[in-house]
């Protein structure tokens, strides 16, 4: 199947309606250039709008660093791990003993929750969120308390507080902020004040995988409490999202030294990171312009998609990440199957939001192509 460049460009331009004339002209030029290089997806090489990855790939500097790392592959990475730990600490504004390096944030989630496993512990999490936290609890035989969502799939902090205060044992509270799959943030003041109140026998695991994408000025990272010395909070970050290193498997936990020491007992060796991953991460840190460019491209793609959804009358939640959560008002599976037939993969089901679809943002050209398919689906009565 082919798509005319003119058609793709027109879709992007229409979707960007509502921007200022100057902004629209600038975006039009970028969209036209991107459309010129765009290759439509195929069954063998589908458009992956399902995993919330950075569609730009690693920065050129990181790719070169990975290739050069082959020369170091025969040696253990002890020294370079410490260089990376120092770089991560500097990035977070902390010290090296605040950092626990992990194989992706998945290991950090698991280790953080397992380190607080007791006979009377419960893991408290919103009903609609990334499932690694509750999955870890289930695998460890820990009680899981899933708290119903508030209006518009918001996280009901008051209800979560009640779940903790009414429990006689210990609690691990798992937050994803910005939340996945909703792409929304919680009220920072409300969350941080709760953590700072130090509820008895309670630790907070705050997964900030998408923090680098947030544009809302009211957002505050829970790292501020770590910096203030609070021992009851662990902040998790990953290199899988804006850093475009999902396949490299690198993440970290950020907490006060005593908390880091506790969690560290539940990872194999935080000095045994992959050499290519270490070198890629260091290269990314040395190239802040790439992160800025990634944010800009993500924002442009988001504008293309949300403008189209507005035009189509499809509701969606305000996005603070690299994906959008939209309401199909119909079961997800038929839509996902039809998109897959077009070589486009969208997000999996997220109960209980069974009529909602999480769409990862591709490049502006990829997103414009998805938008074109949305309009075609509307013509067929499918959305």
Predicted regions and their residues:
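PLP-dependent aminotransferase-like
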Residues: 115-175
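N-terminal "arm"/small-domain region of PLP-dependent enzymes with the aminotransferase-like
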Residues: 24-75, 169
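PLP-dependent enzyme catalytic core of the Aspartate aminotransferase-like
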Residues: 338-341, 350-383
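Active-site phosphate-binding strand-loop segment of PLP-dependent enzymes
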Residues: 151-217
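Conserved PLP-binding catalytic core of the aspartate aminotransferase-like
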Residues: 149-151, 298-299, 309-342, 361
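N-terminal secretory signal peptides and thylakoid transit peptides that target proteins
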Residues: 1-22
């Amino acid at each position: 199947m082919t798509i005319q460049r003119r058609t793709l460009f027109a879709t992007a331009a229409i979707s960007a309606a509502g921007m200022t004339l100057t902004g629209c002209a600038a975006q039009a030029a970028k969209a036209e250039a991107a459309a010129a290089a765009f290759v439509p997806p195929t069954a063998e090489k589908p458009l992956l709008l399902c995993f919330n990855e950075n569609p730009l790939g690693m920065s050129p500097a990181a790719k070169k660093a990975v290739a050069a790392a082959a020369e170091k592959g025969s040696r253990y990475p002890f020294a370079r791990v410490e260089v990376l730990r120092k770089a991560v600490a500097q990035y977070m504004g902390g010290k090296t003993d605040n950092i626990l390096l992990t194989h992706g944030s998945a290991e950090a989630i698991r280790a953080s929750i397992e380190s607080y496993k007791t006979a009377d512990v419960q893991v408290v999490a919103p009903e609609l969120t990334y499932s690694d936290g509750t999955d870890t609890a289930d695998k460890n035989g820990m009680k899981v308390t899933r708290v119903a969502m508030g209006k518009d799939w918001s996280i009901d902090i008051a209800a979560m507080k009640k779940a903790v205060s009414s429990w006689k044992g210990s609690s691990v509270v798992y937050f994803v902020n910005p939340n996945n799959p909703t792409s929304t943030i919680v009220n920072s003041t409300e969350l941080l004040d709760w953590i700072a109140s130090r509820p008895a026998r309670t630790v907070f695991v705050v997964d900030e995988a998408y923090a680098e994408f947030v544009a809302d000025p009211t957002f505050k990272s829970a790292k501020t409490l770590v910096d203030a010395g609070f021992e009851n909070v662990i902040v998790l970050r990953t290199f899988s999202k804006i850093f475009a290193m999902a396949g490299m498997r690198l993440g970290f936990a950020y907490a006060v030294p005593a908390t880091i020491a506790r969690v560290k007992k539940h990872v194999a060796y935080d000095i045994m990171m992959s050499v290519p991953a270490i070198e890629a991460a260091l290269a990314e840190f040395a190239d802040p312009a790439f992160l800025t460019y990634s944010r800009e491209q993500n924002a442009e793609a988001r504008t293309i998609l949300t403008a189209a959804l507005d035009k189509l009358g499809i509701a969606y939640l305000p996005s603070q990440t690299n994906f959008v959560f939209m309401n199909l008002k119909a079961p997800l599976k038929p839509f996902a199957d039809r998109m897959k037939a077009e070589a486009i993969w969208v997000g999996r089901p997220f109960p209980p939001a069974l009529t909602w679809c999480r769409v990862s943002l591709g490049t502006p050209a990829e997103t414009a192509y998805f938008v074109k398919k949305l309009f075609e689906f509307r013509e067929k009565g499918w959305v």
